[in-house]
């Protein structure tokens, strides 16, 4: 990640911009002018496209700092992308196999009408009858698991290498815990993964 501090002094307020970017050495800079436009500058100082990035704007007034805005931040410091693609596939495939094993038990129990589990090519589809469909798939370029749920909507999960589990990259909820909870809500089946 690239870290860059920009300073701009005005009459009484000193503004600092702390910027994080993980996209090919691009740095997103807030043009602190009256227009407040965003521009993106690469290492050659040439204008390029704006990329989604983690932004923290901190304003200092009389030596007191106040956080104004924060967006799209990963809250868990243990989640770093798995660099080895083969290791990533092994970890995700093992997780999906566990899900399929546990969910097939639910399917065989016939406690949830219309319940089906399908898994192939890195995509796990869980059909919960007329209540909706889950799609859980691996995203190799991002080294993430992506989730689409009829209850909680879309989510992205990063691998926590310390806890050895997948966690939501926004709120830190473990993937297994979320799946257990939602299957329990939809199917009234107490599943433990």
UniProtKB/Swiss-Prot annotation:
**Record-listed E.C. numbers:** 1.16.3.1
- Stored InterPro entries: Frataxin (IPR017789), Frataxin/CyaY (IPR002908), Frataxin/CyaY_sf (IPR036524), Frataxin_CS (IPR020895)
- List the catalysed reactions: 4 Fe(2+) + O2 + 4 H(+) = 4 Fe(3+) + 2 H2O
Q: Where is the transit peptide?
A: 1-72
* Cellular component GO terms held in the UniProt record: mitochondrion
Q: Please give one Pfam family short name.
A: Frataxin_Cyay
Q: Which UniProt keywords apply?
A: Heme biosynthesis, Ion transport, Iron, Iron storage, Iron transport, Mitochondrion, Oxidoreductase, Transit peptide, Transport
| Top-rank EC class of the record's enzyme | oxidoreductase
A biological process from GO: heme biosynthetic process
For this protein, the record's PANTHER family field holds: FRATAXIN (PTHR16821), FRATAXIN, MITOCHONDRIAL (PTHR16821:SF2)
Family, according to the entry, reads as follows: Belongs to the frataxin family.
Its quaternary organisation is: Monomer. Oligomer.
Q: What does this protein do?
A: Promotes the biosynthesis of heme as well as the assembly and repair of iron-sulfur clusters by delivering Fe(2+) to proteins involved in these pathways. May play a role in the protection against iron-catalyzed oxidative stress through its ability to catalyze the oxidation of Fe(2+) to Fe(3+). May be able to store large amounts of the metal in the form of a ferrihydrite mineral by oligomerization.
Provide the protein name: Frataxin, mitochondrial
């Amino acid at each position: 990640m690239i870290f860059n501090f920009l300073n701009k002094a005005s009459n009484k307020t000193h503004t600092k911009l702390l910027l994080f970017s993980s996209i090919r050495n691009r740095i997103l800079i807030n043009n602190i002018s009256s227009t407040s436009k965003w521009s993106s500058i690469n290492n050659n100082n040439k204008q390029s496209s704006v990329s989604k990035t983690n932004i923290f704007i901190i304003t200092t007034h009389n030596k007191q700092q106040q956080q104004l805005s924060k967006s799209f931040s990963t809250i868990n410091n243990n989640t770093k992308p798995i660099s080895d693609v083969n290791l990533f596939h092994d970890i995700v495939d093992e997780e999906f196999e566990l899900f399929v094993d546990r969910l097939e038990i639910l399917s065989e129990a016939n406690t949830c009408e219309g319940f089906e589990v399908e898994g192939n090519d890195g995509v796990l589809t869980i059909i919960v009858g007329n209540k909706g469909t889950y799609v859980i798939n691996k995203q190799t370029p991002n080294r993430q698991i992506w989730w689409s749920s009829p209850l909680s909507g879309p989510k992205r999960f990063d691998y926590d290498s310390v806890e050895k589990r997948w966690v939501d990259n926004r709120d830190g909820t473990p993937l297994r815990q979320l799946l257990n909870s939602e299957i329990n809500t939809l199917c009234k089946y107490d599943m433990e993964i």
